Design a protein with these regions (language model features):
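Short, well-structured alpha-helical segments that form the helix of a local strand-helix-strand
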Residues: 45-47, 116-119
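Core alpha-helical transmembrane segments of integral membrane proteins
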Residues: 128-151
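Soluble N-terminal domains of membrane-associated systems
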Residues: 1-110
Length: 151
């Protein structure tokens, strides 16, 4: 007997709020992408709130750190707490702008699939500049800042 049919036989699928979990995961993915692109904690929190509202989540409580997000979502009697870590945060203004535009366009009734597709499209966009050029630009900016500070 397969795992899926085992779950059906015991009624486990009825107990597991699959759609609610998918909504929570989509909200967390948006927050993680924003934090990973250099978004401020206030901007990340605001964008996650907008997404949660658009997807039909009643309440969202978040704690956004420098490299992690802890969020608890609730809808009726259901709740779910998720933790995500951004391992390599960087500043990517282009991605941040695309994510902010997406959150500004969110409307109540949006589906999880629609949000995930929009996030997939943003994630698939190539970076505007190659890594070597970004590295050289950062080195130049740091050097210029040191000169301005009499360093």
């Amino acid at each position: 007997m397969s795992e899926a049919s085992d779950a059906s036989a015991t009624g486990e699928l009825r107990l597991e709020p699959v759609q609610f979990i998918a909504r929570t995961d989509a909200v967390m993915r948006l927050g993680s992408m924003m934090l990973g692109a250099g978004g401020s904690s206030a901007r990340v929190r605001d964008s996650m709130e907008r997404a949660a509202h658009a997807l039909g989540i009643d309440e969202l409580h978040t704690r956004v750190g420098m490299t992690d997000i802890v969020a608890t979502t609730s809808r009726g009697p259901l709740f779910r707490t998720r933790v995500t870590e951004v391992r390599r945060p960087a500043v990517d203004a282009d991605r941040l702008t695309a994510l902010k535009r997406l959150t500004n366009d969110l409307r109540p009734g949006m589906t999880t699939v629609e949000l995930q597709r929009a996030l997939d499209a943003i994630a698939a966009r190539p970076r505007r500049y190659p890594e070597l050029l970004r590295l050289l630009g950062a080195a130049f900016a740091c050097g210029a800042f040191a000169l301005l500070g009499n360093g």
